[in-house]
């Protein structure tokens, strides 16, 4: 096989996904179906194709705040145990169909309480959907392991409660904690209590930082909060200088991020939609990869960005000329950075990822 991977070939490659929002990855048909069942009449279209196009167009807004607006529709149809179970189940199916072998999916339980569900009931429904999806995919010959991150909204005041939820479910499929939402005006340090609670319980967490806001957000996430990973982190490029001769000079923050091997959950297509970068070609992914940061490739929101892991990888291949060895490195980076036990990570790398890439690389 040639060293320039095609999209069809990439679809066969094993993938590891760390940054994907459950409420940003619904099938358009499912949104319509559940909306009809629960009587939600706020959708902009009753045609699946038109609805998918609307989500994509609305999300290509140029700002994170506007990018988040269409989520009101997906969240509206995820307010019952049955709906949460179905969305979780179909998420597993869709990822497995794209050859994802490991995924950490995140969502904010506090957005799903409109019909009186408790946080525990909400998480139970999602985990049950994941488990059933895993069983079905294993039976179909495309095994996948999916784990959950529970997210607190950074503008709200529930982060400690959500962190406690993460610990209650830590042995049932929840592997970590996150904060998300608009960055400007809502720094990570507002949620120190939640992060300290996670550290006190020897638990892992990631923080959305450096997506719409700059270096101060990243600095707080690392220095004050102790983040294990950074959600996006794309603005770390503001602390990197590239000279006329191509020499790369890292600032203090960029250097410690690289040297401590803090993973970056980069989401190229989403970053273009939110205006974090102007285009894939101008995305700092390649600069960060060449500078040996621990970069990972992610979808963020598959419905909103009309994307998949294969498409994200292929866009990088098209833009930066990556080959199979690069894709394998990004995949192993993600698997090394997962919030499951070391032996589980190693097993997936050695017994699934490397053997399947060996066939592709030839």
From Swiss-Prot:
Superkingdom: Bacteria
Positions of Zn(2+) binding: 19, 21, 208, 300
Reactions the enzyme catalyzes: adenosine + H2O + H(+) = inosine + NH4(+); 2'-deoxyadenosine + H2O + H(+) = 2'-deoxyinosine + NH4(+)
Cofactor note: Binds 1 zinc ion per subunit.
Zinc is among the record's keywords: yes
Name the record gives this protein: Adenosine deaminase
EC number in record: 3.5.4.4
